[in-house]
Amino acid sequence: MNSKIPEDLMERAYQGKCTKEDALQLLEVPPFELFRFADELRDLAVGDTVTYVVNRNINFTSRCVGTCGFCAFRTNNGKVLSIEEIMEKVRDAEKANATEVCIQGGLLPEVGLDFYQGIAEAIKAEFPEMHIHSFSPMEVYHASRISEIPVKEALRRLKRSGLDTMPGTAAEILSDRVRKIICPSKLKTAEWVEVVRQAHAAGIPTTATMMYGHVETREERIDHMLIIRDIQKETGGITEFVPLPFMPYNNPVGEKMIREGRYATPGLEDLKIYAVSRILFHGHVDNIQASWVKLGKKLAQFSLHCGTNDLGGTLMEESISRSAGACHGEMITVDELEWMIHGAGRIPKERTTLYRRVELASGNLRKISGCGAYE
C-alpha cells in the first residue's frame, strides 16, 4: 500500500528520532493514514493490551490563590478538607479495591509542606499498600515556597512521608508565551521542568500532561511534547503521556474563545494529537493515555486505534473537568472499561500506577506482578 508518510520520516519514527518538522508534517497526513501508522507503533510498543487503573481522585479544596484563566474549579472561599475527611475518602477507595489515590487541590496561602506530608503519612499509616499519586509540580513548588525550603528538599520530605508518584499536571502548554496568557502566576516552563527533574532524581516518577486547544499554536504543541521527550531521555522517570483537550466553558479563557467563534477541539483533531503523541514518543514513553472524562467514552474507545493504550482510571469523583463543562461523568466501573476495551478488539488489563499488572489470586485477594511492557 502506498503511504503518504515519507519513508525517511517513518524510519526516524521507528528509531525514536522524529523531529519537530516531522511532527508538523504528520499533522498534514490524511487522518486515517496517520492513525494506522500510530497504531502500528502502539502495537510495537505495547501490543494489544489496553490498561486501566482502579483509583480515586480526591480534590481537597477548590480554594486557590492562583489566577489561571482556564480554571472553572477555583473559588475564593471553598472548604478545605481535613486530613480525617480525606482519609474517609481513602477508606472508601480501599473498599472499592482501588490501588491508587490521586490527591490534588488549590493553592492555599496558609498551607505549607506539613499539610501534604500529613496526608501522605496518614494514608501510609492506615493503608501502607495504597499508592499515593499526588501533588502536582505547582503544589510542590508553592508549598516549598510557603515552607521556605528548596524544592529538592520538599520532594525528599514528601518521598519520606510516603509519596509514591506525582501527577505531571500544571504543565498546560510548556511555552512561556502561552503561560503568560492563560496562567501568569503559575510556574514558568523552566520551573515546571526543574520540579519534574528533581522529582525523578528523588525517586518519584511522574506522568506528563498537555492541555491543548486554547491559545497555543500547533508548533507550541509539538515543542511541548519534545520538552517532555527530552526530560524522559535524561531521567526515564515519566510513566505516561496524557493529552487533555481544553474545556472552554465557565472560565475566562474559554468564554473569550466562544465570543470569537472558537469552541472545544473537534474529535478528529483530538485523535490526531493522540496519534502524533504516539509517534513522537515511540521508544521513549510507551504509554499514551486517553481521558474518557475529556473525550467521552466512545471517542476514547476509538482512540485505541489511533495510538493510545490506556484509558486512565475509574476516578470515583472528578470535579475539575466537570466544573469546566465536561459532561461524560466522573466515575466509570471496571466492567464498563473492560466492555469498552473488548469492543475495540483489545485485551483489558488492570494495572498499577507504575504499569504493573494487578491479578486476582486465590481467595479473591489481589496481587501485583510484572507484566512485560508495563514494568
Curated annotation (Swiss-Prot):
| Pathway where this protein functions | Cofactor biosynthesis; coenzyme F0 biosynthesis
EC number in record: 2.5.1.147
For this protein, the record's SMART domains field holds: Elp3 (SM00729)
Cofactor(s) the record lists = [4Fe-4S] cluster
CC cofactor note: Binds 1 [4Fe-4S] cluster. The cluster is coordinated with 3 cysteines and an exchangeable S-adenosyl-L-methionine.
Database matches in InterPro entries: Aldolase_TIM, CofH/MnqC-like_C, CofH_family, Elp3/MiaA/NifB-like_rSAM, F420, FO_synthase_su2, rSAM
State where [4Fe-4S] cluster binds: C64, C68, C71
Q: How does it assemble?
A: Consists of two subunits, CofG and CofH.
Name of this chain's protein: 5-amino-6-(D-ribitylamino)uracil--L-tyrosine 4-hydroxyphenyl transferase 1
Q: Which organism is it from?
A: Methanosarcina acetivorans (strain ATCC 35395 / DSM 2834 / JCM 12185 / C2A)
What taxonomic ancestry is recorded? Archaea, Methanobacteriati, Methanobacteriota, Stenosarchaea group, Methanomicrobia
Gene name?
cofH1
